[in-house]
Amino acid sequence: MAEFLIEPRIRGFISLTSHPAGCAKNIDLQIERIRSENLPMGQKNGLQNVLVIGSSTGYGLGAALTACFGYGANVLGVCFERKPEGEKPGSAGWYNSARASETAAQDNLIFQTINGDAFSDDIKTQTIESIKKEYGKIDLVIYSLAAPRRDDGQGNVWNSVLKPIDQRYEGKSFDLRKESITDISIEPATADEILGTQKVMGGEDWQEWIELLAEQKLLADGARTVAFSYIGPEITQALYRNGTIGEAKKHLENTAIALDKVLGQTSNNTTGTVGGAWISVNKAVVTQASSAIPVVGLYMSILFRLLNERNENESTCCLLYTSPSPRDLSTSRMPSSA
């Protein structure tokens, strides 16, 4: 293979380049950390087949790695990543997924990925067929999608925006390209922008996935599902939690309540788990999505420094084993309001 130099290329808040060796090393370190926990593997943990929608970066990746290399589950991930072409590197998520699959195969574990738009009917169909042929009924569905747009398959293309509601937002941001702190001003969202953001980042697609799996009889008795959310510090409330994304998160949380009422009616006689739906609210993490939020980059740089000083800065893979165990999740119900 010819050698070539990979240099960072930044556009806005997104790095257009990633380093294959660096991504592989990152996955290796996460797997090493997971294995050091000596988690219960096999049927006794109630996790046999796990579907992770949004599996290539962030908390979705962390959950997928922990399910596979920690609990020994068969993992099927869905993500939308760019493949490498010649001297043009692929996206970090593509290399993450490739390394995870390679390592799983070496350890006689299953970590497979379907690469495509998780919102689309085509990818949903491919996923269903893969589950039928290679997995069997799903015990746990992790929903971890963050996207700029969604084609709902009904002729509508929705776009998500990061904007305040009813008032202009003024604050600080970090320019990655110039490596400088800048002042920003963002006008309030329109009604259409609020709705579009809800359609992309809310719970509608999550519910479609669960209903499709149920319709195809691919949810195990006592199946559970988890989606991720974030609250953020006070300094970001006007833009984030009280803005367009916050409205979408409220929709996501209300979707969890609706799904919980349905899934909570089933239980697994072997493991004793009761089905359900949960929202997992987590700490800030560096992703393309979080990098898009003004102020958050500055906030995270301070937060991580303090957490590191206290030895409390957990990686995304810690999520599934520092939370209640897969079986213990059945004892906690989704609150009536979130």
Please report, for each region that a protein language model flagged, where it lies by residue.
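Glycine-rich phosphate-binding loop and adjoining beta1-alpha1-beta2 segment
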Residues: 79-110
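The beta1-alpha1 cofactor-binding region of Rossmann-like NAD(H)/NADP(H)-dependent oxidoreductases
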Residues: 115-127
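A glycine-rich helix->loop->beta "capping" turn
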Residues: 126-155
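Canonical Rossmann dinucleotide-binding motif of NAD(H)/NADP(H)-dependent dehydrogenases/reductases
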Residues: 45-78
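Conserved small/polar residues in nucleotide/adenosyl-binding loops
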Residues: 321-328
